[in-house]
Swiss-Prot record:
Its cofactor is FAD. Its EC number is 1.4.99.-. Pathway: Amino-acid degradation; D-alanine degradation; NH(3) and pyruvate from D-alanine: step 1/1. Belongs to the DadA oxidoreductase family. HAMAP family: DadA. It is an enzyme of class 1 (oxidoreductase). InterPro entries: DadA, FAD-dep_OxRdtase, FAD/NAD-bd_sf. The lineage of its organism: Bacteria, Pseudomonadati, Pseudomonadota, Alphaproteobacteria, Hyphomicrobiales. Oxidative deamination of D-amino acids. It comes from the Bacteria. This is D-amino acid dehydrogenase. FAD binds at residues 3-17. It comes from Methylobacterium radiotolerans (strain ATCC 27329 / DSM 1819 / JCM 2831 / NBRC 15690 / NCIMB 10815 / 0-1). The gene is dadA.
Length: 419
């Protein structure tokens, strides 16, 4: 079977890898000159099944109002006359109940754990290297209130058998020794030893090369104009230069840009771009830098070691498809890393980046078939595209191939929004 994958980010490329391994002829269309050059380029670097949780959670509406008042706020909302944004926010608010949070977090942890295992298998099979470490995540709490609410997450972790340890300040320092220099800043933490870190861009580029060795064709610099369809079948992809490309099956993995492509087919995909930012700074003192990932719970900022660099990622900005770099967001990221690892890296030499995360209202990606028989989606991963990429690609390959998936997947498909 010939499969056309639309999008060459980490999700599209992992989909290509598993489909090629399943014996399919695969072509990837990507508008950029290479793989992984948009949302996958400089993300936070976490592979964090244990930290997988929906943003829609009990108490979030009140917290969001408080965040919007903070100087270094983790949430930024630019007022816009955009009906799709407010429809998306309304759906998200509807998921801020205890029942919905448990259901959505359970789905996310299921896929993320599967994906982490798939990544480990892939690494064993191929020897792929991407500045990865297997040293866990430390969610760091600055306030007693944050620590007291840790049970909201550990109950779901217990249900899915995800290992964790709740730590006092001494335990946090044992996990991340550089925190000893700022021990008065935090009161405790939650350590997730099964989490990993790695450079998603480097991984995507190297996996694309492995895909080519399996016969996958990459057509870079190819922008997609629209899908042609007849009845319940896609018949072709029309590119920006007017070419028509045909296949037996099609996979939409265009991140935040997927809904606009599918809308003319009558498919309403509840995915909205949530803008994130990152700083990447060279390490100046290895002993003063993080060992793995530290998640600053107050500012919702992840600080990750990637080889000889520190990646600082965070912020949720609702600003449509704007890619403008905004100084206040840089200040928030800098504040977090300066608070926790003041001597670890050189901020004067930091690179500043932004990307658009494709978010769903319930936090769970949309992986599976659609009402158009030969069209599949693999999008909506939000902040967890890197965490969930391998599992989503492997799951998608099973679904396209007509094989029984290795994990429950009906509640990951678009149909859950019709339920």
């Amino acid at each position: 079977m010939h499969v056309l994958i639309l999008g060459g980010g980490v999700v599209g490329v992992t989909s290509a890898y598993y489909l090629a391994r399943a014996g399919h002829q695969v072509t990837v269309l990507e508008r950029q000159p290479g793989a992984g050059l948009e949302t996958s380029f400089a993300n936070a670097g976490q592979v964090s099944p244990g930290y997988s949780a929906p943003w829609a959670a009990p108490g979030i509406p009140v917290k969001a109002l408080r965040w919007l008042m903070m100087r270094h706020r983790p949430l930024v909302l630019w007022p816009r006359l955009e009906p799709r944004l407010y429809a998306w926010l309304t759906r998200m608010l509807a998921n801020c109940t205890e029942e919905a949070y448990r259901r959505n977090k359970g789905r996310m942890v299921r896929l993320a754990e599967y994906s982490r295992d798939a990544l480990r298998d892939l690494r064993t099979e191929t020897g792929i290297a991407y500045d990865h470490r297997e040293k866990g995540t430390l969610q760091l709490f600055r306030t007693r209130k944050q620590l007291d609410h840790v049970g909201d997450d550990t109950r779901v972790l217990d249900a899915y058998g995800v290992p964790y340890t709740v730590l006092d300040p001494a335990g946090c320092i044992a996990a991340e020794p550089a925190l000893a220099a700022v021990r008065d800043v935090f009161v405790g933490g939650l350590r997730l030893p099964g989490d990993e870190t790695g450079d998603a861009h480097l991984f995507t580029q190297r996996l694309a090369a492995l895909c080519e060795s399996l016969g996958v064709t990459f057509r870079y610099g190819t922008a997609i104009a629209r899908l042609h369809h007849a009845g319940d079948r896609v018949t072709a992809v029309e590119t920006a230069d007017g070419a028509l490309l045909r296949a037996d099956a099609y996979v939409a993995a265009l991140g935040s840009y997927t809904p606009a492509l599918l809308r003319p087919l009558g498919i309403a995909l509840p995915v909205y771009p949530v803008k994130g930012y990152s700083l990447t700074l060279p390490i100046t003192d290895a002993e003063a830098a993080p060992v793995s990932t530290v998640m600053d719970e107050t500012y919702k900022v992840a600080i990750t070691r990637l080889g000889d660099r520190i990646r600082v990622g965070g912020t949720a900005e609702l600003a449509g498809f704007s890619n403008a770099l905004r100084g206040p967001r840089r200040e928030t990221l800098a504040r977090s890393v300066q608070d926790l690892f003041p001597a670890g890296g050189d901020l004067d030499k930091a690179s500043f980046w932004t990307g658009l995360r494709p978010m769903t209202p319930d936090g769970t990606p949309i992986v599976g078939g659609t009402r158009v028989g030969n069209l599949f989606t693999n999008t909506g991963h939000g902040t967890l595209g890197w965490t969930m990429a391998c599992g989503s690609g492997r799951l998608l390959a099973d679904l396209v191939s007509g094989r029984a998936p290795e994990i429950a997947s009906d509640d990951l498909a678009l149909g859950r929004y019709a339920a």
